[in-house]
Amino acid sequence: MSRKGPAPKRDVNPDPIYNSKMVTKFINKLMLDGKKGLSQRIFYKALELVGERTNEEPLEVFETAVKNVMPVLEVKARRVGGATYQVPVEVEPNRKQVLAIRWIVNYARERGERAMSERLAGELIDAYNNTGGAIKKKEDTHKMAEANKAFAHYRW
């Protein structure tokens, strides 16, 4: 086992257009097979579509959408005497953002529109309006935590 300790956290550079680190993280999560240029084109096109459809500032819609999807609680498996309990725990700030981005990208990929930029725009608008797959996933996560509230004292 390594004695060096955990690897240092690497910080991402802000994106060139909106100068936002959250946008860079989103683009990286959207990327498949190392094709970052394609990922950027899809994302910026999606934001253009969001701007056209909502008549609001696209970056604000994006940030609000991510904020709306961020979970407050999640469950973690904890073994106690041979039984595994789903223990509700609060989600750390960085993980909130990571989960929100992951859910938005995954549910955008599952949508029915033809182009990925259209799917992503649709999912962002839905998340902005507190509807859609990513919001449902957040609510399901919260329901799981609420249902297992009895095991909260097993928190570590």
UniProtKB/Swiss-Prot annotation:
Gene3D superfamilies per the UniProt record, alphabetical: Ribosomal protein S7 domain
NCBIfam families given in the database record: rpsG_bact
Gene Ontology terms: biological process: translation
Organism expressing this protein natively: Natranaerobius thermophilus (strain ATCC BAA-1301 / DSM 18059 / JW/NM-WN-LF)
Keyword annotations from UniProtKB, A to Z: Ribonucleoprotein, Ribosomal protein, RNA-binding, rRNA-binding, tRNA-binding
UniProt-listed InterPro entries: Ribosomal_uS7, Ribosomal_uS7_bac/org-type, Ribosomal_uS7_CS, Ribosomal_uS7_dom, Ribosomal_uS7_dom_sf
Gene: rpsG
Gene Ontology terms, MF aspect: rRNA binding; structural constituent of ribosome; tRNA binding
PANTHER family according to UniProt: RIBOSOMAL PROTEIN S7 (PTHR11205)
Subunit structure: Part of the 30S ribosomal subunit. Contacts proteins S9 and S11.
Cellular component, GO annotation: small ribosomal subunit
Protein name as annotated: Small ribosomal subunit protein uS7
PROSITE patterns: RIBOSOMAL_S7 (PS00052)
